[in-house]
Amino acid sequence: GPRCENPIELDIPVYITGMSFGALSYEAKTALARGATMAGSATCSGEGGMIPDERRYSEKWFYQCIQSRYGFNPHHAQLADGIEVFIGQGQKVGMGGHLMGQKVTDQVAEMRSLPAGIDQRSPARHPDWLGPDDLALKVQELRELTKNKVPIQLKLGAAKVYDDVRMAAKCDPDSIYLDGMEGSTGAGPHIAAANTGIPGIAGIREARRAL
């Protein structure tokens, strides 16, 4: 993130991607935070907002801005070491999310301002932008929110990689994260996970060509 005041440096070229509290338990989220810190890596909030203990145990922590905005809090964004704008996911490219009602506990429901025990569905696109020009404005908005102190990262699902990466690069983020089909999800239909997306390695080649 050379465009920001406090770029993130990792000891290893791997970090723990966004997995929401709800999809994962409190114990899993905090354990992953501790493990990432021990490994010199980072973790990400995923959808649904911030767990204070995850932030406490993560030396380097991304806060995710996702389509639904469930749990998104500007004050929590200012506590992050980086902001990740979720645009797509490798195993369900172009689709929204689905959290089963049995995982929407009282605590999860409170964080997301939703009724407990009811299935939660996320839309496929963000409500406040429709294309590349709007995305560039969103990146700038997040820079202003964080006072340009932390990197802004765009997360893309690997599909039309060449075109998508060219579009994302024009929005002037600090980094572009390409998610391949290998990444698992419990928030999409099996038919999409089994039959869509491309491998991350193949996507990297197209991303390099785009840049």
Question: What label would you give each PLM region?
Answer:
Residues 1-123, 134:
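N-terminal capping/small domains of soluble enzymes
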Residues 126-211:
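Glycine-rich phosphate/ribose-binding loops and adjacent secondary-structure elements
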